[in-house]
Structures are given as C-alpha cells and as structure tokens.
C-alpha cells in the first residue's frame, strides 16, 4: 500500500543508466577488479505462507528501486527478444516464478506492486497475461503511467547500447546484464517479529522521491488494517484499498 511508482526519466532513470553503463565499462576493461556499485538499502519483512504458497516478503522500504530494477530486467528481456538472443529466456527467470503455487495468478510474479500500478506493471513484465483476471477493471484516466515511460526509456537506451549499425552485439548486451546482476549492490535488511514496520517506514531516509503526507497516511492506515485480524491477509485488505483509497490515488484533472 505504498505510493505509486514515482521515478522520472530525469533525473532518476538517467542517473541509474549512467551507473550501469559505468559498471559495464569496468567489467569490459577488467572484470576481476570491479567493485560493486552501492545502490542503497532495502528493508523487508517475511510474510507467513502456508502449504504450496511461494515464500514472500513485504517491502517496507526500497519499493521504488526494486520496481525499477524489475522494469529494467523486462526492458533487457524485450531487447534480447528483438535481437534473438539466448538471454531472453534467462532474463524471464528473474521476473517470473515457476513450479507449484497456491495462487499462480499472483505468486508467479516476483514482485506484486500496489494496486494503482499493478495493471501497468504486469503488462510490462508479462505482456501475454490476462489482466482482467488479475486486476480490477480500471478506467482510462488519459495519463501515461511513469512505469510505462520508464520501460520505454530503458528499452531505448539499451537498444542504442547493444545495436551497432543495426546488428545486435551479444557481448555488449552481456556486459549490461552482468553490470545489473553482479556490478550493483543493495543491502537487504530483514525485520524481526518484534519490529514495527510502520515506524521504520516513516523514519527511513532514501535517495528516491520524497514521501508526501498522503503516502505516509495511506501506509499507516493499511498497515493497521493488516494487523486487525483480516481474514485471508493482504488479499482482503486489497479490496479495502480498492474501495476506499484507490479513488484518491487517481488524478483529479
């Protein structure tokens, strides 16, 4: 129940691409001497799962970065498909879970974003998905989602990097993939049972886009709702969010 995806092409995505290009260049020059580029920290809390459910974690802080990296992976995959690269199948493994699941329509996705971005995000990650069976029907508000803009921008810069004179350069593609996979580092902090996720969420400072009072209020309300004995866990709270808060997240004009 965090805010909508908020990263812009300028400055966040441009800076991210510069970091990745810089790391890729170092890998190409001397792979053994590359020191991972630190991208900040993320805070997670394990969600109780049962039976065939996929192990899951709630993102307390780091949602924007994790969403961005997922979009970047999808962009890499899409360019790999265009270049008929063997990496297209490999990249899909970082976006989609496989195996036996309790709720495959949800659990097959490595990342399950907030309701306002869910349809857009899944369309990027899994273009063949049946969106009507996964997310509620959303009205066309006439706005292009920032996740869509991010996807188009990242595909464009990756294409320019790996297509030389119209030909797909497998080596240049590999170095970008390696830069993302091995050359960037994020510290993952997992909360313990006695930690208060809401307090930690409010006090953490990140390098991303500042939280608004509405972002803090929304997170507080739905964290409290999750702790009030909701039957079925977050899926029922999703319905509460859709009915009472989702209209507030839509553009007013």
Model regions: which residues?
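Covalent nucleotidyltransferase
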Residues: 1-253
């Amino acid at each position: 129940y965090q805010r909508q995806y908020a990263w812009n092409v300028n400055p966040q995505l441009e800076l991210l691409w510069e970091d990745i290009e810089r790391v890729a260049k170092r890998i190409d020059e001397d792979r053994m001497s590359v020191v991972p580029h630190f991208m900040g920290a993320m805070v997670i809390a394990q969600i109780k799962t049962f039976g065939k459910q996929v192990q899951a974690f709630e993102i307390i802080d780091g949602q924007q970065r994790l969403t961005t990296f997922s979009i970047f992976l999808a962009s890499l995959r899409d360019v790999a498909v265009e270049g008929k690269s063997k990496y297209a199948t490999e990249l899909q493994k970082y976006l989609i879970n496989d195996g036996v699941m309790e709720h495959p329509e949800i659990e097959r996705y490595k990342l399950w974003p907030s309701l306002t971005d869910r349809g857009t995000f899944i369309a990027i990650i899994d273009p063949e998905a049946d969106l009507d069976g996964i997310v509620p029907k959303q009205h066309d508000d006439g706005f292009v989602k920032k996740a869509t803009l991010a996807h188009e921008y990242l595909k464009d810069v990756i294409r320019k990097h790996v297509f030389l004179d119209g030909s797909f350069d497998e080596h240049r593609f590999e170095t970008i993939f390696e830069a993302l996979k091995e050359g960037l580092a994020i510290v993952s902090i997992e909360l313990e049972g006695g930690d208060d996720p809401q307090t930690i969420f409010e006090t953490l400072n990140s390098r991303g886009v500042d939280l608004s009072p509405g972002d803090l209020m929304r997170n507080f309300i739905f964290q409290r709702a999750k702790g009030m004995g909701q039957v079925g866990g977050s899926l029922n709270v999703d319905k509460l969010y859709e009915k009472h808060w989702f209209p507030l997240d839509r553009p007013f004009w």
